[in-house]
Amino acid sequence: MTSVVAAGLKQVPLFSDLSQRQARQLAKHFKERTIPAGVQLTRQGEMSGVAFFVIADGTAAVIVDGERVGTIGPGDHFGELAMISETERTATVEALTPMRCYTIQFWNFRKFAKNNPDVTWKLLQHVTDLLMEERARRARISITAS
């Protein structure tokens, strides 16, 4: 199963630059989860952000402040902030269909990242992009509310 997960990780932009060896090393730490439709995988504001998710099958709604802001599916991922900081979840993610995901706990990712600084750098760039998008979204909401 590790080789299947490793191949899947290489399809995720965040991990696309991994060597085959790195992908196999990281894949060992991912666990497969099956999630029924209707289950919330994360809840906005909760401090339980200890896992990063990669969706293999199914779709989920992304909900921010009670409003559905997007839909994610196979190849998409979420929970990046949990990989670098124990922080509140920024969105609720709810399964719209039955899902199969691969998850990694932040402490396992950190062990891997310590030995692979290029992965840490790419994650930092990705999280910075997410934060900039969130800042722009909040600015639009603020302008609309004025």
Language-model segments: residues:
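ATP/adenylate-binding site constellation spanning eukaryotic-like Ser/Thr protein kinases
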Residues: 57, 74-77, 98, 106, ...
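A small-molecule sensor/coupling module
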Residues: 5, 22-25, 89-90, 107-146
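Short beta-strand His + acidic residue motifs that chelate non-heme Fe in jelly-roll/DSBH
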Residues: 62, 80-81, 91-95, 111
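Ligand-binding loop in jelly-roll beta-barrel domains
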Residues: 86-107
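Structural motif
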Residues: 13-16, 30, 76, 88, ...
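Short acidic-glycine-tyrosine-enriched beta hairpin
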Residues: 67-80
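Regulatory nucleotide-sensing modules
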Residues: 5-6, 10-65, 72
